[in-house]
């Protein structure tokens, strides 16, 4: 960060407060390999979903990768508690099998899997809705809290829109939904955050 500030802005300037420190354009993570560690210490590369056309890459060493996982656990447990819950993942299990195509969706599924007592997938390999898997999930855990996880646009396109054709199939009033990423695709579909929440309720 310091090197970037020195390159882009006035060199050797002293800042008296954090309000004076310049911001960096987030697009730099898409166009440059920004690293604060040597290549030999790279433990994990986080890749964004790239819904805007170009993916960002963040390079972590083992220490910061562990801290990232601990931070995720600390934040999420405030919402769902410390117990693991049955989880319905709005994606296909195949996304974890092809390491060459591994992306932000796969990384997010792996990250949030620490909260799952048992995992079910809502989609088949061809991204069609797996009704049998969803029915099994609902019937098995009808009277207890459950967790649903997926990317924002995946939940909209493959769960909300598809299951609208099967009214009465799902009762997810006992579910906690966690979604993230993919808002660019929602904007392309002219779906506002308000409309998204309204459909889910």
Label for each model-derived stretch:
Residues 2-45, 56-58, 69, 74-80:
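Active-site diphosphate/adenylate-binding microenvironment
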């Amino acid at each position: 960060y310091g090197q970037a500030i020195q390159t882009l802005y006035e060199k050797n300037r002293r800042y008296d407060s954090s309000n004076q420190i310049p911001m960096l354009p987030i697009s730099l993570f898409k166009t440059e390999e920004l690293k604060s560690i040597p290549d030999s210490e790279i433990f994990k590369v986080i890749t964004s979903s790239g819904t805007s056309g170009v993916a960002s890459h963040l390079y972590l060493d083992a220490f910061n990768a562990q801290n990232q996982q601990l931070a995720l656990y600390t934040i999420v447990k405030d919402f769902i508690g410390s117990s693991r819950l049955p989880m319905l993942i709005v994606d296909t299990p195949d996304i974890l099998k092809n390491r060459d195509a591994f992306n932000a969706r796969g990384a997010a599924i792996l990250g949030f899997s620490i909260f799952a007592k048992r995992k079910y997938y809502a989609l088949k390999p061809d991204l069609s809705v797996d009704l049998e898997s969803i029915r099994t999930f609902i019937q098995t855990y009808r009277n207890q809290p459950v967790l649903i996880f997926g990317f924002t646009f995946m939940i909209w396109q493959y769960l909300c829109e598809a299951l609208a054709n099967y009214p009465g199939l799902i009762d997810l009033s006992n579910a906690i939904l966690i979604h993230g990423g993919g808002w660019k695709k929602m904007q392309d579909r002219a779906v506002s955050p308000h409309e998204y929440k309204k459909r889910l309720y």
